């Protein structure tokens, strides 16, 4: 297969796509990354829920005419979702959710965060129970298919015990469930980003859950940002600072930690990486100073970040620089979710009478 040039459709192009006849209700929608992926695949998002205010503003800026539920998910009843979605129990085609996952992130201390109130984005709350709130709604709505997304750290270490609880809870309402760790770099995204994807199919449909197959090619960060201006919203590294010195001494594709250790003896800057244009970008996180350009002493610009995150160039980001970076860092890459959605449509939903 010939590798096509890297390109993400514009917001106008996505909104003009014909509806494939299938409806999605989304929870923990964030800025709308997964919702955008479903729209890229031709689905209609008939319900979305997001509790974080800045994420709400970003979602509304991009989908001003779409319904967005802003209450805490714990206050939402299955009947609320079905009423807004215009469906009866058992009619919804796909129920999506990305419960907050920082307690299980491989970049954090997974088990230490269980059962505790912690800061998630702009809110302080318990987040380790939210997956079960998703299951509560799933049980009440009874969609044909569900997709639940989380970090890859959910299936690692002693977090596996929590993973098994989630898997059992997802199967309890009567679903065949499959779980895989998918890497966005094999699904059209120029970024190394592993996510745990649960796909469930209602038992009475008699079909097994499916996941997308890897594409036969990958895109590099250099290909993704080609044609973009070098100037833009970015954090500049000031000459004379430690970070600038480490950046100068670091080769593309390497962490600044080696230079830090050599110059100071300290083991720091482990997640600060100078990107290599011939490779995929490192995982975008909520931190603003982790992905550096290979020739310019700065972070990636927000426009470059959109490209690396699989978002349209004209996708609106609200808030300050840190909040804008966080929105992309927390989002499911739309191009990745589009591949998941297309596979489900072709191999499951089209087979259901």
For every predicted segment, state its role.
Residues 1-41, 55, 61-87:
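S-adenosyl-L-methionine
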Residues 45-46:
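Short beta-strand element of Class I
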Residues 52:
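Conserved SAM/SAH-binding beta-strand->alpha-helix loop
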Residues 237-353:
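C-terminal target-recognition/interaction regions appended to catalytic cores
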Residues 30, 59, 95-98, 134, ...:
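Conserved small-residue
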Residues 39, 56-60, 67, 79-94, 102-274:
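Class I S-adenosyl-L-methionine
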């Amino acid at each position: 297969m010939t590798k096509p040039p890297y390109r993400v459709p514009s917001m106008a192009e996505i909104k003009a796509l014909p509806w494939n006849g299938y409806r999605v209700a989304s929870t923990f929608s964030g800025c709308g990354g997964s919702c955008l992926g479903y729209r890229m695949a031709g689905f209609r998002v008939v319900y979305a829920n997001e509790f974080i205010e800045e994420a709400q503003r970003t979602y509304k800026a991009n989908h001003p005419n779409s319904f967005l539920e802003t209450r805490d998910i714990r206050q939402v009843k299955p009947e609320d979702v079905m009423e807004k979605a215009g469906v009866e129990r058992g009619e919804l085609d796909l129920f999506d959710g990305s419960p907050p996952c920082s307690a299980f992130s491989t970049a954090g201390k997974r088990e230490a965060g269980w059962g505790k109130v912690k800061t998630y984005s702009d809110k302080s709350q318990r987040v380790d129970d939210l997956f079960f709130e998703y299951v509560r709604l799933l049980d009440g709505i009874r969609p044909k298919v569900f997709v639940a997304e989380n970090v890859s750290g959910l299936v690692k270490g002693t977090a596996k015990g929590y993973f098994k609880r989630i898997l059992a809870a997802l199967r309890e309402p009567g679903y065949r469930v499959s779980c895989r760790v998918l890497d966005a770099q094999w699904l059209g995204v120029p970024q190394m980003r592993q996510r745990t994807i649960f796909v469930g199919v209602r038992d009475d449909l008699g079909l097994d859950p499916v996941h997308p197959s890897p594409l036969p090619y990958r895109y590099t960060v250099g290909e993704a940002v080609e044609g973009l201006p070098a100037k833009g919203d970015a954090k500049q590294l000031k000459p004379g600072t430690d970070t600038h010195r480490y950046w100068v001494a670091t080769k593309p594709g390497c962490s600044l930690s080696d230079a830090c250790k050599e110059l100071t003896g300290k083991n720091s800057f482990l997640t600060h990486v100078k990107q290599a244009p011939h490779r995929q970008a490192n995982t975008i996180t909520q931190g603003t100073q982790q992905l550096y350009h290979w020739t310019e002493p700065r972070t990636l610009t927000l426009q470059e970040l959109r490209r690396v995150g699989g978002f349209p160039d004209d996708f609106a980001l609200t808030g300050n620089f840190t909040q804008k970076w966080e929105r992309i860092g927390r989002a499911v890459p739309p191009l990745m979710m589009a591949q998941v959605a297309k596979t489900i449509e072709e191999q499951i939903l089209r087979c259901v009478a």
